[in-house]
Amino acid sequence: IMKKLTLLTLMCCLCLSLWAQKTVTVTSPDGKVEMRLNIHADKLTYDLYHAGNAVLTDNALGMQINGQEITAHPKMTGQRSKHIQETICPVVPLKFSAIENNCNETTVNFKNQFSLVLRAYNDGVAYRFVTRLKEQVEVDYETIGLNIPNDCMLHVQETENFWTSYEEPYVHVKSGEWKEGVMSTLPLLIDAKSCKLLVSEADLRDYPCAFFAHASTGLKAAFPPMPTRFEPWYDRRLK
């Protein structure tokens, strides 16, 4: 009986470990860039690979909406993938009059009325949260982690608060020496020796810009909190 009980216990533990994590992978059209979404029992993380080599691993990814952390205890309900090959012509062309958009995209659906769209390009990756909530959405916070070694060189535009005109000069500092209490605007450049990582964002509408600050494992995102009220400040501003 003890042998059967022990065997049953081991089988149960094995089943729990198998269900504890699922990984969804999206790869660039040339097969060199890879983003892996790790669906744990209680959280989401992501890994980045280039040419088979790990660039960033076990990076935190999450979001809290309307007081609920939708990425806690994530339950995947399905996924779909597609290849995107199109030419984008900006209404107001700046550097290019035509931009080639070539990537592989995977949309991962979750039980808490949200999806995560992952894209892998030949020169980078991108992601986006998409909700299926009918009511008005208020984002409490978004979690983005960048786990980098302490000897990476950072090229950052430093600021001590969220009120910035984005005119500060860029400074160059090692990640392990970047002091706490200081943030960086985007874009920021990380020299990871094996490759260089440019972190940026796009398509912001009614959403605050991200900043990045020092964390115990590298860098973490910080966002301006939603103001509870506005009042005039000087002759042409609100605060």
Predicted regions and their residues:
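Boundary at the C-terminal end of the N-terminal hydrophobic targeting segment
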Residues: 18-20
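N-terminal accessory beta-strand-rich subdomains and adjacent acidic, glycine-rich linkers
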Residues: 25-239
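Sec-dependent N-terminal signal peptides
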Residues: 5-14
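N-terminal cationic leader/targeting segments used for protein routing and processing
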Residues: 4-5, 23
